[in-house]
């Protein structure tokens, strides 16, 4: 009996290591549209503020997550591929096939599924395996409901608020365009369910779910994090804690959007 050889494909978004990476990185994100000088300058500033260019940990976060996963699965053929950087997803699929892999199991560094997010990785894997006969794949589309994910955030939130009173906790994730109401609804429901379980286990009295990092055009899933901050301030919150549990690593959307922009709003409102 023939047993097909399985391989692990670790998929991540990608992050620029130098300023020279920015234009091709942004062009890929924008589906081939080259960014303007102003757009490059804006993102450069954000990366400058968080220290991206001198922080190896920020530059190699996905690679370190991948290597950690390999310690749990040391005997399976594996490869890492990025949506917007090298090595590409096609490069990673090619590497697995060269190792004799016949069935690819892909996992994305995003705990919640969206067709625009996780689905984009899935489409690239599908396109890449089209070049090879008899190669199949499955994608682990979501893993937010795994006990270890909830346990991690319960501990993180508990450690953050400790014995602090009057804390308003804002759970956040990346917003998505409202072009597919079913996709947005299922995404929002998953976030709400996960946040509710974490909040209950942490005995949180005041909390909400909000959405961040939306593009400046079109209609996006809300409320925004800024709106949630204003709501919490209006309710008299003294302390506000952000839980960006839709992300699995520190990067610009956490270290700048939350730690810089959100902090400015909180400070201006007289809270901490």
Where are these regions (language model features)?
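Active-site-proximal alpha-helix that buttresses catalytic centers in soluble enzyme cores
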Residues: 1-272
């Amino acid at each position: 009996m023939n047993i097909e050889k399985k391989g692990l494909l670790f998929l991540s978004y990608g992050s620029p290591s130098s300023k020279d990476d920015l234009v091709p990185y942004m062009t890929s994100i924008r589906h081939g549209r080259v960014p303007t000088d102003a757009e490059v300058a804006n993102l450069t500033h954000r990366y400058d503020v968080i220290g991206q260019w001198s922080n190896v940990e920020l530059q190699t976060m996905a690679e370190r997550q991948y290597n950690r996963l390999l310690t749990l699965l040391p005997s399976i053929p594996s490869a890492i591929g990025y949506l917007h950087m090298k090595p590409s997803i096609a490069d990673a699929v090619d590497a697995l096939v060269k190792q004799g892999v016949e069935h690819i199991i892909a996992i994305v560094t995003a705990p919640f599924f969206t067709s625009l997010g996780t689905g984009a990785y899935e489409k690239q894997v599908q396109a890449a395996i089209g070049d090879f006969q008899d190669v199949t794949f499955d994608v682990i589309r979501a893993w937010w409901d795994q006990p270890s994910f909830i346990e991690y955030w319960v501990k993180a939130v508990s450690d953050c608020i400790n014995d602090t009173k009057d804390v308003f906790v804002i759970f956040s994730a990346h917003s998505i365009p409202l072009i597919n109401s079913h996709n947005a609804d299922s995404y929002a429901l998953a976030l709400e369910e996960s946040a509710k379980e974490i909040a209950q286990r942490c005995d949180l009295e005041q909390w909400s779910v909000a959405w961040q990092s939306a593009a400046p055009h079109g209609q996006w899933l809300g409320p925004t994090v800024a709106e949630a901050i204003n709501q919490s301030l209006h309710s008299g919150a003294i302390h506000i804690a952000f839980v960006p549990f839709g992300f699995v690593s520190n990067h610009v959307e956490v270290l700048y959007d939350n730690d810089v922009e959100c902090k400015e709003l909180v400070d201006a409102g007289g809270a901490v």
